[in-house]
C-alpha cells in the first residue's frame, strides 16, 4: 500500500514541531529541503516521550519466551499489551509493527524522530555527548541537590558496586537502573510529563552541543523538572546509547522497510533510511545501495582460517595452478579507518575530508576536515599526498601510531593521545598518527568495489603519492608459493606486529563481509592453541565468597550449523553447551556483562529446560553442567575465550570442551549470530588434531634417541573392583564375588596348596594354616597342579624354601608362590562399606611385594609394585601393627622428603624426581571435574612459567630489581614458576625503573631484543607473551590472570 495516498496536510502543531526540531541544527530548513527534497512531513505532532517506553520498550522487555521455547509471556497488563500465545519472534514483531503502524496513522511518515531515540547508538547525525556514567551521576547529584556522600549520592557515584552503602540495590552494574532508584525518591513528577519525542530530541541536540558542566547542568534541570523517574531512566539509557530492549537494529530496520538495512550498511545514516524509505512499496535500485562519497560504509573484513599448513591456507584463498599468485600484507595494530576526500572550494585548501572508523564513529574532528584545518592531526600535512588529477576518492586503511624518534610503530592504545598532541603541536617529534592505506574504493566519482584488487591497487598507486610518515601506501609482497609466508611471519614476530593478511588479487571488494578473499594469519602463543574463540553466553552460575550472590562464571554455547536449521532439526537460536568459563574476568568485565544482560536472565527449571535454545550434556534426563540461570542467545553477549587445548567431554552437549578456559574480552562488536558455530568448531578441531599428531611424531623421534628411564604411570585400580574390560586387573583370579560377604566365606571359590609352615607375621604349622583357610571357605589341595581337568587355578602358599618349594620353582619358574602373610592380611582387613562399630573383617587384597615369596613373571611384580606407594605402604590395606609402620618409616630416606625450596611448581613434584604426588595433575583433574580454582590466588599463576627481563646490571638505582623481586613473589605465591631460560617461558615480563622517558626507551630496547631472539626459533614453536610488569600487578589485584594483550611490552 502506498502511504503517500493517505498523507494529510500538516496541522499547525506539526508545522511548528518540524521547525522546532529541524530548524536549529547545522542546516536550516531550506537547506534540509534542498538536500532531501522528498523528505516526509508529519501531519500531527509526535507522541509523548512516555509512549515510546510504555507501548514499545516495556512491552518488548516483558515479551519473554517460556522455558520450553514454545510460547511467550506477553506484556504485563497496563504496559501497552495483552497476553498472547504466539511465538516469541512473532510477538516481538507485532509490538514493533503496532508502534510503527500507529505512528504512520496518528503522526505521519517521518519516523526519524522516533528512530533516533530507539537506536541512539546508530544515530550519526547527532554529535557526541561526551557524557559517561560518572559525569551524569555528578550532574544528577547537583540537580537533585543532594550530598554526593549521602547514601543515594554514594550509590549513584558507585553504581558498579553490588548494593552501595545499604547493600539492598538490585541495579548493580546498571547505571540507568540506579538512577531510577535514586530519582524515584525525589522526582518532581509522579506521572509522566508532557515532553514529546520531538521535544526530547531538541533538548538532546542542545546537550550534544553543550560543552562543560555549566552548559549541561541547565539542560538536565529541565529534563528533571518535566520528567518522572521512569522517563529519566530511559533518557539516561538513550544518552549512554545502551537500550537493552531485546531487539536489534536489524529487526527495527527490516520492519520499517525491506531495503532499510541495505541502505544503512552503505550510508550509516538513520536520517537517509527514514526520509528516503518512508514508503514500504518503494524499492531501491541496485546502484543506490553502493558506496557514496561522504557517507560511511561497512568495510570488508579478513577471515581467520584455522588450517594446519601454509599450503591449505593458500588453497583456501582460491588460487589455482593457472593463477597461483597471492598477496601478503602486514596486519597492523591500529584502528581501521576509511577516508573520504572531495573537492570543495568553500574550505581552506579546496578539499574536504571525512574519517570514519569500522564502527562508523566520525573522527573528522580529530584528523581534520580540510588541508587548511589548523586543528587537524593529519590533513594539514597532506597538501602533496595526492596526484593532481584526483578530484575525489575513498580510501580504506589503518590508522596507526608511529614514533618518529625511533621510527617504529607503537601500540594502538597510544593513538588518540598522539593525535590530540599533534593537533596542538603539529611539528613535534615523537608519536604521531600515520594512515597506512591498502585499498581504494572510489576515484573521481567512479566506484571501484566491483573491480579486482589488482586493478584497485593500480588505481591506488596512481592516485596516492603519499607523505612520509603521515600517509603511506601499505607495501605488500607478491607470492606464488606457500613457502613465502614463513619468513615474513618471522619478521613480523621480531617487529612485534600483529600478523599477516593474505589476499586474493583477483577478488572484488565485498562490503560488510568477512570471507576467504582476505585471510589473516597470527603467530601462536605458548599458553594458547591459536585464535581465541568467540562464544555466545547461554547460562550463568552464582559464585561464593567475595563473588557471592552474583554471576561469577558463565556457560558458553556453540551455535548449531545451518544444515540443522534448514532441515528443521533445530531453531536458529539453538546452541549446544560447550564450555564453562570463570577465570580471567576483571570486576569491570562482570559489571559490563551485567550491564548488557540485566533483566534477561531466567531461572533454570530442570523440569522444563529451554531445549529450543540450549542443549546440555546428558540431555534432558541428566542435564550435566546445568546453570543456575539461562539467557536467550539473541539477548546475550559474545565473549572471547582462550584455552590450553580442546578435549573430549560428555559433560557438554558438543562432546568437546576447552581445557583451562580463560576469559579474554567482551566482544560487544559481535552479534550473537556471528559467534562460533558447529562448522567453524569442526575446522578448529581438525587443525588441533593435525597439530597434535605432528607434535607426537616429533616426540617419538626424540624418544628414539633417548632411552626411557621411568616406567609409565598406570591408573590406580581399587582393590576388589577391577575393571572387567581389563585383561590385567590387579587381582584377576582372586577378586571376590561379593566384597560385603561375611569373613567366613572370604576365600570361597579359591583353591590353595600350602607347601610350608608360616614364619611371619604369625608362626603357624602347615596343618594349622590349612585349617585356617578351610574355616574361611577355601579349598585345600596337596598338589599344585590340577589333574581333575576342571581348569582350576591353585594358589601355592609358602614361607620357607623347603624341598617341595625348590622343586616347584625349578619345574615351573613362571608360577607365582604367595606368602602366608597375604592370608593373614586379608583376614584382618575391615570390610568396605560397613560402619566402624560393626567391626566386620575380611577383604581380599591385591598382591603386594611383601606377599610374594617367588614372582614368576614381570607382570606379577609390576602389579604388586602398583599396589603400594614408593615407601611400601599399601594403597588398599591398613597397616597390621606398629612394627609394620616402623618398618615403612625406616625405609624412608631423607632424600624422599621435599622441602619448600626443592618443590618444583612447574611439574608439581619434588626436584628429586620419582613417582610422588603430581599436584598439577591432581589440580587439572579437579578443574576438569568442575571444581573451580578461579578464586584461589595460591593457584592463579600455576600454568605460567615466567622469565623476567631487566635492564643491564649497573643501570639505575636498583628500583627495577626491587620491583622484579616483588613481582616474582606474586608469581611464586600463585604457584607459578620463575624460570631462568627464555626457551621454557610462557611469559616474559619486562621490568624497568619507575615511569619516565628513559624507562620507556629501555623497555622498547629489551622487548625488541627478546622478539629478535624469539623470531629465530623454529617456525611453529609457540611463543611466549612479552608483557609489562603491570600484567603481574593487575592480575594479582584482580585475583585472576588478566588478558595479556593490554600489557604488551615495547
From Swiss-Prot:
Q: Where is the active site?
A: 331
A Pfam family it matches: DNA_ligase_A_C
Q: Does the keyword Electron transport apply?
A: no
For molecular function, the Gene Ontology terms on record are: ATP binding; DNA binding; DNA ligase (ATP) activity; metal ion binding
Where do the annotations place Mg(2+) 1 binding? 398
Q: Which InterPro entries match?
A: Adenylation_DNA_ligase_IV, BRCT_dom, BRCT_dom_sf, DNA_ligase_ATP-dep, DNA_ligase_ATP-dep_C, DNA_ligase_ATP-dep_cent, DNA_ligase_ATP-dep_CS, DNA_ligase_ATP-dep_N
Q: What is its main location?
A: nucleus
- Output compositional bias ranges, type Basic and acidic residues: 691-702
In what residue span(s) does the BRCT domain sit? 742-840, 936-1049
Q: Which cofactor does it need?
A: Mg(2+)
- Region Disordered: start and end of each range? 1-22, 691-711
Coiled-coil annotation reads none
This one is known as DNA ligase 4
Amino acid at each position: 500500500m502506498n502511504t503517500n495516498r493517505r498523507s494529510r496536510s500538516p496541522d499547525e502543531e506539526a508545522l511548528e514541531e518540524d521547525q522546532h526540531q529541524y530548524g536549529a541544527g547545522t542546516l536550516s530548513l531550506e537547506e534540509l529541503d534542498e538536500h532531501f527534497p522528498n523528505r516526509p512531513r508529519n501531519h500531527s505532532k509526535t507522541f509523548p516521550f512516555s509512549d515510546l517506553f510504555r507501548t514499545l520498550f516495556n512491552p518488548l522487555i516483558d515479551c519473554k519466551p517460556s522455558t520450553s521455547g514454545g510460547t511467550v509471556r506477553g506484556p504485563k497488563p497496563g504496559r501497552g499489551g495483552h497476553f498472547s500465545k504466539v511465538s516469541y519472534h512473532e510477538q516481538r514483531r507485532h509490538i514493533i509493527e503496532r508502534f510503527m503502524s500507529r505512528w504512520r496513522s496518528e503522526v505521519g511518515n517521518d519516523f526519524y524522530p522516533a528512530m533516533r531515540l530507539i537506536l541512539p547508538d546508530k544515530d550519526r547525525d547527532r554529535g557526541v555527548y561526551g557524557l559517561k556514567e560518572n559525569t551524569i551521576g555528578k550532574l544528577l547529584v547537583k540537580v537533585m541537590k543532594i550530598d554526593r556522600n549521602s547514601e543515594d549520592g554514594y550509590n549513584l557515584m558507585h553504581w558498579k558496586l553490588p548494593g552501595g552503602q545499604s547493600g539492598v540495590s538490585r541495579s548493580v552494574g546498571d547505571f540507568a537502573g540506579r538512577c531510577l532508584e535514586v530519582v524515584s525518591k525525589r522526582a518532581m513528577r509522579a506521572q509522566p510529563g508532557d515532553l514529546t519525542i520531538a521535544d526530547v530530541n531538541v533538548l538532546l541536540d542542545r546537550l550534544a552541543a553543550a560543552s562543560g558542566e555549566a552548559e549541561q547542568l541547565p539542560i538536565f534541570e529541565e529534563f528533571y523538572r518535566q520528567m518522572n523517574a521512569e522517563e529519566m531512566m530511559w533518557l539516561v539509557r538513550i544518552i549512554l546509547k545502551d537500550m537493552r530492549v531485546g531487539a536489534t537494529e536489524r529487526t527495527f530496520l527490516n520492519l520499517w522497510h525491506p531495503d532499510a538495512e541495505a541502505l544503512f550498511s552503505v550510508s550509516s545514516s538513520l536520517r537517509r533510511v527514514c526520509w528516503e524509505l518512508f514508503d514500504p512499496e518503494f524499492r531501491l535500485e541496485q546502484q543506490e545501495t553502493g558506496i557514496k562519497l561522504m557517507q560511511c560504509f561497512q568495510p570488508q573484513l579478513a577471515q581467520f582460517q584455522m588450517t594446519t599448513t601454509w599450503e591449505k591456507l593458500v588453497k583456501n584463498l582460491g588460487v589455482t595452478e593457472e593463477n597461483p599468485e597471492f598477496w601478503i600484507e602486514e596486519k597492523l595494530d591500529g584502528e581501521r579507518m576509511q577516508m573520504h576526500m572531495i573537492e570543495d572550494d568553500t574550505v581552506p585548501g579546496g578539499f574536504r575530508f571525512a574519517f570514519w572508523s569500522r564502527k562508523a564513529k566520525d573522527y573528522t574532528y580529530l584528523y581534520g576536515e580540510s588541508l587548511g584545518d589548523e586543528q587537524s592531526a593529519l590533513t594539514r600535512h597532506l597538501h602533496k599526498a595526492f596526484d593532481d588529477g584526483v578530484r575525489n576518492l575513498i580510501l580504506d586503511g589503518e590508522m596507526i601510531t608511529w614514533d618518529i624518534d625511533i621510527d617504529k610503530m607503537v601500540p594502538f592504545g597510544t593513538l588518540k593521545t598522539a593525535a590530540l598532541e599533534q593537533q596542538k603541536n603539529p611539528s613535534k617529534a615523537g608519536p604521531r598518527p600515520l594512515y597506512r592505506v591498502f585499498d581504494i574504493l572510489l576515484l573521481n566519482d567512479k566506484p571501484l568495489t566491483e573491480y579486482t584488487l589488482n586493478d584497485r591497487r593500480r588505481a591506488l598507486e596512481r592516485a596516492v603519492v603519499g607523505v612520509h610518515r603521515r600517509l603511506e601506501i601499505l607495501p605488500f609482497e607478491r607470492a606464488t608459493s606457500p613457502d613465502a609466508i614463513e619468513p615474513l611471519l618471522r619478521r613480523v614476530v621480531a617487529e612485534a606486529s600483529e600478523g599477516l593478511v593474505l589476499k586474493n588479487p583477483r577478488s572484488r571488494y565485498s562490503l560488510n563481509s568477512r570471507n576467504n578473499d582476505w585471510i589473516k594469519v597470527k603467530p601462536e602463543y605458548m599458553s594458547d592453541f591459536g585464535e581465541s574463540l568467540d562464544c555466545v553466553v547461554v547460562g550463568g552460575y552464582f559464585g561464593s565468597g567475595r563473588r557471592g550472590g552474583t554471576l561469577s562464571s558463565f556457560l558458553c554455547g556453540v551455535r548449531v550449523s545451518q544444515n540443522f536449521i534448514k532441515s528443521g532439526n533445530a531453531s536458529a537460536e539453538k546452541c549446544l553447551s560447550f564450555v564453562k568459563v570463570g577465570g580471567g574476568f576483571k570486576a569491570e568485565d562482570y559489571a559490563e556483562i551485567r550491564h548488557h544482560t540485566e533483566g534477561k536472565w531466567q531461572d533454570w527449571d530442570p523440569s522444563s529446560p529451554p531445549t529450543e535454545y540450549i542443549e546440555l550434556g546428558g540431555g534432558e534426563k541428566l542435564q550435566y553442567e546445568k546453570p543456575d540461570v539461562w539467557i536467550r542467545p539473541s539477548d546475550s553477549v559474545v565473549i572471547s575465550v582462550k584455552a590450553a587445548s580442546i578435549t573430549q567431554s560428555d559433560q557438554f552437549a558438543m562432546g568437546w570442551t576447552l581445557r583451562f578456559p580463560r576469559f579474554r574480552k567482551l566482544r560487544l562488536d559481535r552479534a550473537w549470530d556471528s559467534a562460533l558455530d558447529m562448522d567453524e568448531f569442526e575446522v578448529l578441531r581438525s587443525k588441533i588434531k593435525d597439530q597434535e599428531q605432528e607434535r607426537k611424531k616429533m616426540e617419538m623421534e626424540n624418544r628414539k634417541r633417548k632411552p626411557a628411564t621411568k616406567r609409565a604411570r598406570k591408573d590406580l585400580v581399587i582393590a576388589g573392583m577391577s575393571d572387567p574390560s581389563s585383561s590385567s586387573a590387579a587381582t584377576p583370579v582372586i577378586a571376590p564375588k561379593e566384597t560385603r560377604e561375611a569373613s567366613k566365606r572370604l576365600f570361597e571359590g579359591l583353591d590353595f596348596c600350602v607347601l610350608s609352615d608360616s614364619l611371619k607375621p604369625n608362626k603357624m604349622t602347615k596343618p594349622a594354616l590349612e585349617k585356617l583357610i578351610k574355616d574361611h571357605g577355601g579349598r585345600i589341595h596337596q598338589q599344585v597342579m590340577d589333574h581333575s581337568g576342571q581348569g582350576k587355578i591353585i594358589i601355592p602358599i609358602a614361607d620357607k624354601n623347603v624341598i617341595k618349594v625348590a622343586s616347584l620353582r625349578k619345574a615351573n619358574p613362571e608360577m607365582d608362590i604367595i606368602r602366608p602373610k597375604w592370608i593373614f592380611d586379608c583376614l584382618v582387613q575391615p570390610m568396605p562399606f560397613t560402619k566402624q562399630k560393626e567391626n566386620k573383617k575380611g577383604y581380599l587384597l591385591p598382591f603386594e611385594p611383601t606377599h610374594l615369596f617367588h614372582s614368576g613373571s614381570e607382570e606379577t611384580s609390576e602389579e604388586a609394585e602398583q599396589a603400594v606407594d614408593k615407601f611400601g605402604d599399601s594403597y588398599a590395606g591398613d597397616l597390621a601393627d606398629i612394627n609394620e609402620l616402623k618398618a615403612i618409616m625406616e625405609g624412608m630416606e631423607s632424600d624422599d622428603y621435599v622441602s619448600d625450596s626443592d618443590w618444583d611448581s612447574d611439574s608439581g613434584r619434588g626436584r628429586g624426581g620419582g613417582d610422588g604426588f603430581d599436584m598439577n595433575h591432581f589440580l587439572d583433574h579437579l578443574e576438569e571435574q568442575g571444581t573451580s580454582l578461579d578464586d584461589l590466588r595460591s593457584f592463579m599463576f600455576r600454568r605460567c612459567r615466567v622469565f623476567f627481563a631487566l635492564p643491564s646490571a649497573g643501570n639505575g638505582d636498583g628500583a627495577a630489581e626491587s620491583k622484579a623481586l616483588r613481582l616474582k613473589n606474586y608469581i611464586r605465591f600463585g604457584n607459578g614458576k620463575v624460570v631462568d631460560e627464555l626457551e621454557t617461558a610462557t611469559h616474559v615480563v619486562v621490568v624497568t625503573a619507575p615511569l619516565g622517558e628513559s624507562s620507556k626507551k629501555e623497555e622498547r630496547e629489551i622487548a625488541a631484543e627478546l622478539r629478535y631472539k624469539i623470531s629465530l626459533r623454529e617456525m611453529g614453536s609457540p611463543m611466549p607473551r612479552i608483557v609489562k610488569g603491570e600484567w603481574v600487578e593487575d592480575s594479582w589485584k584482580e585475583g585472576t590472570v588478566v588478558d595479556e594483550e593490554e600489557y604488551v611490552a615495547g
